Amino acid sequence: MNQVYNFSSGPAMLPVEVLRRAEQELCNWHGIGTSIMEISHRGKEFIAVAKEAENDLRDLLSVPENYKVLFCHGGARGQFAAIPMNLLGDKVKADYIDGGYWAACAVKEAKKYCTPNVINIKTEINGLKSVKPMREWSLSDDAAYVHYCPNETIDGIAIHEQPDFSDNKIIIADYSSSILSGPLDVSRYGMIYAGAQKNIGPAGITLVIVREDLLGKARKETPSIFDYAVLAENDSMFNTPPTFAWYLSGLVFKWLKEQGGVQEMAKRNRAKAELLYDVIDKSDFYRNQVAPENRSLMNVPFQMVDASLDSKFLAEADAQGLQALKGHRVSGGMRASIYNAMSIEGVQALVDFMADFERRNG
């Protein structure tokens, strides 16, 4: 079988080393005669797995001691509801930064629980999609928190700035598609959350990193399974957690540390993205519609000037082992998601195919 490279936006590819280790351990984990999927989440074996995963994540992101790390159910969409239920307190309004599709989804859910002050930061630079810099965000004085999404997967738009607002601003960020892709100053945020299925592990588990002083403020009607204080008190095991996803995420954390950590990931991810954007920018056949300063390093959408060739491109790419390149239904075209597990060799294979396709069809 030819080498396959999976450019899916999520669930995304996992490091092959992680998959091989999971395969080796699947039926007989650490010699106990059963699978990790079959053991009790309250047994000493799994508790050790869970704690090790948390410790490795804390090391990777240098998570301060006054932050809780939670492994939750419900995905990022679950957090769209959990955030206002937990963090609104006695206020009625929260600032929501609208930079794209997923930010808008968060707003839609938040409207059930609070009054979102929607701050539209979408703009254009020389006809290319962009977002306003943080210094131009018109934040409210009376908002409970500020919510934003640093990386919009569909349009491939990224906010590369780290927040630097006044100390009384509680910043909440949806890092689902860019967590662990580079260094991150957790202390600048009140809370960070991320669905696992892009840069952490398989679908089914959600990471929440929340500052301790924000716990215990949930509305009384908040379901216990979404109450951060309840989850923290029970070490994310208020009910049976998604144990296999937790275990696999822990293997990914170990792999990241073995590779050199998030600093090394940042170098690799920039190199991969530059390789792909360079081919697009030098071509009259392909185009990317995002301003260079806001281009995502994780999700690279591109279109062909002749959109009638899209189906042919996708079919031929798939036949060569370049999978899941179809763009989101909202934006069309193509999209290459190049998360941590994607190798530079995979991106090189894609750009080689793109150059060949242009020669034959341009």
UniProtKB/Swiss-Prot annotation:
The UniProt annotation places pyridoxal 5'-phosphate binding at 76-77, 102, 153, 174, 197, 239-240
Indicate which residues the UniProt annotation says bind L-glutamate. 9, 42
The parts of the chain that form a coiled coil are none
> Where does it live in the cell?
Cytoplasm
- EC main class here is transferase
Per UniProt, which keywords does this protein have? Amino-acid biosynthesis, Aminotransferase, Cytoplasm, Pyridoxal phosphate, Pyridoxine biosynthesis, Serine biosynthesis, Transferase
Write down the SUPFAM superfamilies for this protein, in alphabetical order.
PLP-dependent transferases (SSF53383)
Q: Does the keyword Cytoplasm apply?
A: yes
Concerning CDD domains, the annotation shows: PSAT_like (cd00611)
Residue ranges of the TM segments: none
Q: For this protein, what does the record note about how its cofactor is bound?
A: Binds 1 pyridoxal phosphate per subunit.
What Enzyme Commission number does this protein have? 2.6.1.52
The record's catalysed reaction(s) read:
O-phospho-L-serine + 2-oxoglutarate = 3-phosphooxypyruvate + L-glutamate; 4-(phosphooxy)-L-threonine + 2-oxoglutarate = (R)-3-hydroxy-2-oxo-4-phosphooxybutanoate + L-glutamate
Q: Which InterPro entries match?
A: Aminotrans_V_dom (IPR000192), Aminotrans_V_PyrdxlP_BS (IPR020578), Pser_aminoTfrase (IPR022278), PyrdxlP-dep_Trfase (IPR015424), PyrdxlP-dep_Trfase_major (IPR015421), PyrdxlP-dep_Trfase_small (IPR015422)
**Which cofactors are required for activity?**
pyridoxal 5'-phosphate
Q: Which GO terms describe its cellular component?
A: cytoplasm
From the UniProt record, give the pathway where this protein acts.
Amino-acid biosynthesis; L-serine biosynthesis; L-serine from 3-phospho-D-glycerate: step 2/3; Cofactor biosynthesis; pyridoxine 5'-phosphate biosynthesis; pyridoxine 5'-phosphate from D-erythrose 4-phosphate: step 3/5
Post-translational modification N6-(pyridoxal phosphate)lysine, affected residues: 198
UniProt GO BP:
L-serine biosynthetic process; pyridoxine biosynthetic process
- Oligomeric state and partners? Homodimer.
Job of this protein: Catalyzes the reversible conversion of 3-phosphohydroxypyruvate to phosphoserine and of 3-hydroxy-2-oxo-4-phosphonooxybutanoate to phosphohydroxythreonine.
Q: What family is this protein classified in? A: Belongs to the class-V pyridoxal-phosphate-dependent aminotransferase family. SerC subfamily.
Q: What is this protein called?
A: Phosphoserine aminotransferase
Q: Which organism is it from?
A: Photorhabdus laumondii subsp. laumondii (strain DSM 15139 / CIP 105565 / TT01) (Photorhabdus luminescens subsp. laumondii)
